[in-house]
Structures are given as structure tokens and as C-alpha cells.
């Protein structure tokens, strides 16, 4: 699972998911990509599940780039705990994704194989996505 090696602060505010992604919205490394169409938090488990699904599907040959990184800690309170007494402890990490953001890129495979692999990865994501081709 992806997570930062160390952070400056243990806990973060939740923040808001306003607007569209101005950074990371173009294909940089590969030929095919999966692009987010909705705003959400994507957990490190979901990122890893999508990556594994794509890797298994393209087998040998082809290269995959993961373009998002979970750098935001999400805190949870213990179950059956009364309100108050501070914020909960960090439980997992999420990547903040806005519409237009590229999630995965791929190259070195035929388009039909890439389309199939990326659609399987898209089914692991909690949002609507689209398959795009560079050029």
C-alpha cells in the first residue's frame, strides 16, 4: 500500500473538493490513460487494487504509471466512543482527486488490451472515469 514515508504533521483538515484538476490532467508518460470525471478521495487500497488488476491483465510487456499518490491522512475515532476528547488517530491514506485528473497511464500494449485492462481498473474506482489516448 502506498503512503508517505514521513509527514510534517500527523493530522490534516478534511478540506473541500472544489473545481477541476489543473495539474496532472494530461498524459505525460504512456499512450493510454484513465481519467477521473468526478471529485473524490481515493484510498491507497483502491489505488493498489486498480494497479494489480491492470498488471495482471497486461501480463508481460507494457508499462504502467500510477499518477496519484495518497498523501492525506484520514482519521477515525474508535467505535462506541463519546464525542469530544480530541480528533481520532490516522487510520488510512487517501489521494484527493478532482475531475480531469489522470489516475493511471499505460504504454507498450495494443489498444484493445489497454482498453480492457483500464476498464477493469476503472471498476475498482469509486467514481466515473474515462479511457483516453494521447495524441
From Swiss-Prot:
Instruction: Cite a single GO MF annotation.
Output: structural constituent of ribosome
Q: Which UniProt keywords apply?
A: Chloroplast, Plastid, Ribonucleoprotein, Ribosomal protein
Organism in which the protein naturally occurs: Carica papaya (Papaya)
Gene Ontology biological-process annotations: mitochondrial translation
Work out whether the entry's keyword set contains rRNA processing.
no
> Which CDD domains does the record associate with it?
Ribosomal_L16_L10e
Primary location recorded for the protein, binned into one broad class: plastid
Among the Pfam families in the record, one is Ribosomal_L16
Instruction: Tell me its family.
Output: Belongs to the universal ribosomal protein uL16 family.
Q: Name one GO cellular component term.
A: chloroplast
Q: Where, subcellularly, is it found?
A: Plastid, Chloroplast
InterPro entries membership: Ribosomal_uL16 (IPR047873), Ribosomal_uL16_bact-type (IPR000114), Ribosomal_uL16_CS (IPR020798), Ribosomal_uL16_dom (IPR016180), Ribosomal_uL16_sf (IPR036920)
- Output this protein's name: Large ribosomal subunit protein uL16c
- Oligomer and partners: Part of the 50S ribosomal subunit.
Amino acid at each position: 500500500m502506498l503512503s508517505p514515508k514521513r509527514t510534517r504533521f500527523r493530522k490534516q483538515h478534511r478540506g473541500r473538493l472544489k473545481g477541476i484538476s489543473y495539474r496532472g490532467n494530461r498524459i505525460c508518460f504512456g499512450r493510454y490513460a484513465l481519467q477521473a470525471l468526478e471529485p473524490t478521495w481515493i484510498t491507497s487500497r483502491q489505488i493498489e487494487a486498480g494497479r494489480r488488476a491492470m498488471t495482471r491483465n497486461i501480463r508481460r510487456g507494457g508499462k504502467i504509471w500510477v499518477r496519484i499518490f495518497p498523501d492525506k491522512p484520514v482519521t477515525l475515532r474508535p467505535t462506541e466512543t463519546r464525542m469530544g476528547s480530541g480528533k481520532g488517530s490516522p487510520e488510512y491514506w487517501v489521494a484527493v482527486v478532482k475531475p480531469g485528473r489522470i489516475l493511471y497511464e499505460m504504454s507498450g500494449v495494443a489498444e484493445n488490451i489497454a482498453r480492457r485492462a483500464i476498464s477493469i481498473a476503472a471498476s475498482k474506482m469509486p467514481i466515473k472515469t474515462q479511457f483516453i489516448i494521447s495524441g
